[in-house]
């Protein structure tokens, strides 16, 4: 179902394109040997190139180029064997050179696509226009002194990939799904950590509105540097609503750059939107055009890990998990790997149910992730094996899992220590049931008189008497036999 916003003149459609700035995972910066590591004391990860000292020449980091190519391959995009670096000229205090080295006319990556899953079960393809490499700027700090601002150049010169989508997004939900999928791909490939809270992935959001059926785009506004998926979705809604109100009041929307204030739930004008000529782009005279070999691209492609969509399809085929289950299991590569280790030696469906249910719930309660789980994949597999061979039942297994999370002990050790082995002795089960039936003779008569729901009562009382250790199937079977006497 199409997303629409209703105004005083009827329904409106939103049109969104996203420019995602993803920090490249590399040890050094794009054109210098300074560390690209996040954090550190201010101005400790700075070379003379980053600081814009006269006479310092940029030297391209080969690994950053490789990371851009890997990302392009992950986006099923065109890899341009010829690309070029340009100077984007503008003045800002945290840009020491007075220009940013970027790629304007000839980006390293061309058209690609991202496949996103939506809440209604449908799938949409969002086009990628281009990906280019560029330098990040430094950081201006305004809250340390009432009269002065400070500059930290640790981030200056760090390699960024700017990934530009086509204006294919038609709802806040689609924008969120696109960003989540893009981040997932980058993390799988290892080209960006996707930590939006650290600024290593942020989005500029281009929003316009139009009447359903219109084919031309109306004037768009760009919302700069939105640093969470939730805020991107909120910003789209409030900016679209603002533009609709402007159009319906008989006004026109100005092309401008805006900021999103999540506290007030509004966007505010920052400056008029710049065009390319405002930046006076020209080829960087200190850098040769970038020419890469197809054979190198092929090598990088052959070494890529299995990508999310391929992994999902394989899990569904090999292990019989549902589309929803595969989407959750493949959110992170570590989760998918954990699941496969469990499923290889256990009932694959049981493994999926337990991971998505009790196991994730236990991790969430203790504030842990899959990487620092106190229960290993082998440990969870052992627990599921105890269920499958009827050593313990599902209810007891939940108790054992809680103990495993708290103590780190193995499932079998906990079962032995606590005496939790399931009772499969039919004589012991029959004895327990006879005691329950004798103590509840009135309910036995009611059951035999047609009150079938009491069967669950007898099962519950039996399991309680056996401290949850009775084999459920044997309890049910024996109970039916005794009640029919």
UniProtKB/Swiss-Prot annotation:
Origin organism lineage: Bacteria, Pseudomonadati, Pseudomonadota, Alphaproteobacteria, Acetobacterales
GO biological process: glutaminyl-tRNAGln biosynthesis via transamidation; translation
GO MF term list: asparaginyl-tRNA synthase (glutamine-hydrolyzing) activity; ATP binding; glutaminyl-tRNA synthase (glutamine-hydrolyzing) activity
InterPro entries reported in the protein's UniProt record: Asn/Gln-tRNA_amidoTrfase_suB/E, Asn/Gln-tRNA_Trfase_suB/E_cat, Asn/Gln_amidotransferase, Asn/Gln_tRNA_amidoTrase-B-like, GatB, GatB_C_1, GatB_Yqey_C_2, Gln-tRNA_amidoTrfase_suB_CS
Enzyme nomenclature, EC number: 6.3.5.-
Cystine pairings recorded for this chain: none
Biological source species: Gluconobacter oxydans (strain 621H)
The name this protein goes by in its record: Aspartyl/glutamyl-tRNA(Asn/Gln) amidotransferase subunit B
SMART domains for this protein: GatB_Yqey (SM00845)
NADP recorded as keyword: no
Family membership noted in the UniProt record: Belongs to the GatB/GatE family. GatB subfamily.
Keywords linked to the UniProt accession: ATP-binding, Ligase, Nucleotide-binding, Protein biosynthesis
Catalytic activity field: L-glutamyl-tRNA(Gln) + L-glutamine + ATP + H2O = L-glutaminyl-tRNA(Gln) + L-glutamate + ADP + phosphate + H(+); L-aspartyl-tRNA(Asn) + L-glutamine + ATP + H2O = L-asparaginyl-tRNA(Asn) + L-glutamate + ADP + phosphate + 2 H(+)
């Amino acid at each position: 179902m199409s997303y629409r916003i209703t105004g005083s003149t009827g329904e409106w459609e939103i049109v969104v394109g996203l420019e995602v700035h993803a920090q490249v995972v590399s040890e050094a910066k794009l054109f210098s040997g300074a560390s690209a590591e996040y954090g550190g004391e201010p101005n400790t990860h700075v070379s003379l190139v980053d600081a814009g000292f006269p006479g310092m020449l940029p030297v391209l980091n080969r690994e950053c180029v490789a990371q851009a190519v890997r990302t392009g391959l992950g986006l099923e995009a065109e890899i341009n064997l010829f690309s070029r670096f340009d100077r984007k000229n503008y003045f800002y205090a945290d840009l020491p050179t007075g220009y940013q080295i970027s790629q304007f006319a000839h980006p390293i990556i061309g058209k690609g696509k991202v496949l996103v899953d939506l809440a209604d079960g449908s799938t949409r393809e969002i086009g990628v226009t281009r990906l280019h490499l560029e330098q990040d700027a430094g950081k201006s700090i305004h809250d340390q002194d009432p009269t002065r601002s400070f500059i930290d150049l640790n981030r200056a010169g760090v390699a960024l990939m700017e990934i530009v989508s086509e204006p294919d997004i038609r709802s806040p939900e689609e924008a969120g799904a696109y960003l989540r999928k893009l981040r997932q791909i980058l993390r799988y490939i290892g080209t960006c950590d996707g930590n939006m809270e650290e600024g290593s992935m942020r989005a500029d959001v281009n929003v316009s509105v139009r009447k359903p059926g219109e084919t031309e785009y109306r004037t768009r506004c760009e919302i700069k540097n939105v640093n969470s998926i939730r805020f991107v979705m909120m910003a789209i809604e409030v900016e679209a609503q603002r533009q609709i109100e402007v159009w319906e009041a008989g006004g026109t929307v100005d092309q401008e750059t805006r900021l999103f204030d999540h506290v007030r739930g509004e966007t505010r004008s920052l400056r008029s939107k710049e065009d390319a000529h405002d930046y006076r782009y020209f080829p960087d005279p200190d850098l040769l055009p970038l020419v890469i070999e197809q054979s190198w691209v092929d090598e990088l492609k052959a070494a890529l890990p299995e990508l999310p969509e391929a992994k999902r399809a394989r899990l569904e085929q090999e292990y019989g998990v549902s589309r929803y289950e595969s989407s959750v299991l493949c959110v992170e590569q570590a989760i998918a790997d954990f699941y496969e280790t469990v499923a290889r030696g256990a009932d694959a469906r049981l493994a999926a149910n337990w991971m998505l249910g009790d196991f994730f719930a236990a991790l969430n309660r203790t504030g842990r992730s899959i990487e620092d789980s106190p229960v290993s994949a082998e440990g969870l597999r052992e627990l599921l094996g105890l269920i499958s061979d009827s050593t313990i039942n599902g209810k007891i297994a939940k108790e054992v899992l809680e103990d495993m999370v708290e103590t780190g002990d193995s499932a079998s050790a906990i079962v032995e220590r606590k005496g939790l082995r399931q009772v499969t002795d039919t004589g012991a089960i029959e004895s327990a049931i006879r005691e329950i039936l004798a103590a509840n003779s009135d309910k036995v008569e009611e059951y035999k008189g047609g009150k079938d729901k009491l069967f669950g009562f007898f099962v519950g009382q039996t399991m309680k008497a056996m401290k949850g250790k009775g084999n459920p199937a044997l309890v049910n079977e024996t109970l039916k036999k005794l009640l029919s006497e």
